[in-house]
């Protein structure tokens, strides 16, 4: 990486972690990546100041933050942590010429054309090839919440499509899913897709599948549920994980239909990346392809797991450099 005299600061801020790094004009990629816990800082401003102090960098020229929240008039209020970010306030504090907030999955969408074969794992039998001309992609991924976005290229222009589709209502497709929904409605006024496909979502499913025999329910966190499913020590954990992946597939399939993303759907998120083999042998593709009259179309859409360490930072770095280029 070149001089840090006027660096470009990028960040990928989720409900739990904030990852910061630097990029530079004319460079590719990023450097000086550090992960911070959101709970350790009163605000994003404080976390950024701590990051810059740790690496000994000067105030950034451009700041681009990918945030796990809807961005409205360059302001972000998180649903899964206490931070409130206003772009203008960041610009004033750090004397940055430009600050831009983008949705975290919009940032991941920007990374999709930049990923190498080594960054991807094919899920299903349909081979993926990066189109040479126009394309439409979708990306989805569970973490603290559930993110979704799209990326469209038409000619020499690329358009990201951020959204909050994961807060749409959950639509069960099997009798067992109907029963899970009915159980969860006793806990939540409204059951969104994110209530089932996220870190908390797998715990909700695990609780719901115990409602035929509540006395057997033992509270487990998401990591414990996945571990028990892998070693087969808990049949309810196996059931919960099966449902988790099938429902993820259903929602990913809905995303593909909504965007007409026939060129590919990408799966991101820290949860899934920890269990690639579990995903590969799960009912994900069954849920993805089960679209009635559109089943034959769905069978032709490739699905891939993103293995890159931080596609959010990769996409944010690309976006930030484009932003800096326009500024100059």
Residue ranges and their predicted role:
Residues 2-56, 179-328:
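ATP-binding/phosphotransfer module of carbohydrate and carboxylate kinases, centering on a glycine-rich
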Residues 53-101, 106-119, 272-277:
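Short beta-strand-loop/turn "lid" adjacent to the catalytic site in phosphate-handling enzymes
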Residues 37, 80-81, 100-107, 128-130, ...:
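Active-site nucleophile and cofactor-binding loops and adjacent substrate-binding regions
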Residues 125-126, 132-194, 276-277, 284-289, ...:
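Glycine-rich phosphate-binding loop of actin/hexokinase-like ATP-binding domains
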Residues 25-28, 80-84, 115-123, 153-160, ...:
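A glycine- and small-aliphatic-rich helix-loop capping segment at beta-alpha/alpha-beta transitions
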Residues 18, 70-72, 145-149, 204, ...:
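Short, acidic Gly/Pro/Ser/Thr-rich loop/turn segments
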Residues 1-4, 48, 101-137:
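Conserved phosphate-binding catalytic cores of ATP/NTP-utilizing and phosphoryl-transfer enzymes
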Residues 8-12, 62-64, 100, 137-141, ...:
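Short glycine-aspartate micro-motif
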